[in-house]
């Protein structure tokens, strides 16, 4: 038995081989060919994107192409698409030597993930039982982007510590788990979650955190020199923040009902985000005796309000209610970066590179709670009888559901997303821990040179790069910053 255990230890601790010349091309080619075959078998245009749209218009007495769903949904789709590829990608460029990996691997897994998501979500939500086909339109593309967002959130927890092959495997399983938990929450429990506080952010957050916990690196301090930012990398990350911040109202309203529901979701998210910024700046400044702002907080915590309002965005939460949610999220998220992230790494052994627990996981749970309370408190006097039925879709098998029952199912949906994130992350993390994926050694983490060809001047002048801004580390704060903080370390540990 002892020899077996020692053999396992030796197997998992063998020297890292980061040469992915064979594995990455094989995985990309095989999976893309598989997508082509599966799309050929299952995927077809829906009636609004098919050439038979002309006949559909005549049959349904539609007089103008403007009634095609494309013209209603495409602006929101484009905003969401920019968030996925530009917003998430650039938000993760804060590391001084991992910008290629942040944007490039974000591009890679999003491009694969959206194809797999169209299939998985199609099989669960829109498979025609008569033809066995999946009919897709512009709303399908939005939902696929939403699915990919969960995987990109998870990527933030393991940024710089995994290989592109591991990321593709993580995305394959992540999209699959997402489709299942989304079906359970939205279809079986009939919870409402237009902006994905539960389905996207809570699941993606805990999925990534659990994978990071399984892949814990006790010697990650060997790459400490890379675990920080330089001035220009923070500016690039701030570009991602601004794109996400500007387009988050579209994210939360993209698949809501036509008319007042979408209008209300935009207003609520707009106000919530604005409130979050002021609170984040206040807490960031107050936490330091010098009153200086921490760029980590400004890049990330300012977005937490958009995450937290995702579930309740289309509800009658009222404008001042949206401001309250943003106010609370700014406090909780910023305090999370100051106290909870160091605790997670030191005590729970969770190395959260981008601090997704503070930007996605915690605000996602807050969003689930806000959604449950708001749903349970809904009334005909506020919504109107028909609007109440329309907002919560109390039709068909759910026509007799009360608002209190709906609130309970909203809370149940949040629990489902956490369970899927943690359980799925544990299983997938165990698979990714196998020493066959070409992941970097501890001393080479957070360095683009492992997987990317870098410009000659970068290689020649690597040693002359300005010192990193160590305070911009999403996992651990610099000791002197904590010692100069208005919040004591003793209070943090208590």
Curated annotation (Swiss-Prot):
Locations listed in the record: Apical cell membrane
UniProt keywords, alphabetically: Ammonia transport, Cell membrane, Glycoprotein, Membrane, Transmembrane, Transmembrane helix, Transport
Glycosylation: residue positions: 61
InterPro entries reported in the protein's UniProt record: Ammonium/urea_transptr, NH4_transpt_AmtB-like_dom, RhesusRHD
Positions of transmembrane segments: 23-43, 75-95, 100-120, 134-154, 167-187, 195-215, 235-255, 266-286, 298-318, 320-340, 359-379, 412-432
Lineage: superkingdom: Eukaryota
Membrane topology according to the record: Multi-pass membrane protein
Chain ranges on the Cytoplasmic side, renumbered to this chain: 1-22, 96-99, 155-166, 216-234, 287-297, 341-358, 433-494
Parts of the chain on the Extracellular side: 44-74, 121-133, 188-194, 256-265, 319, 380-411
Gene Ontology terms for molecular function: ammonium channel activity
Gene Ontology CC, one term: apical plasma membrane
GO biological process, one term: ammonium homeostasis
General function of this protein: Functions as an ammonia transporter. May play a role in the elimination of ammonia in the gill.
Protein family: Belongs to the ammonium transporter (TC 2.A.49) family. Rh subfamily.
Subunit structure: Homotrimer.
Listed name of the protein: Ammonium transporter Rh type C
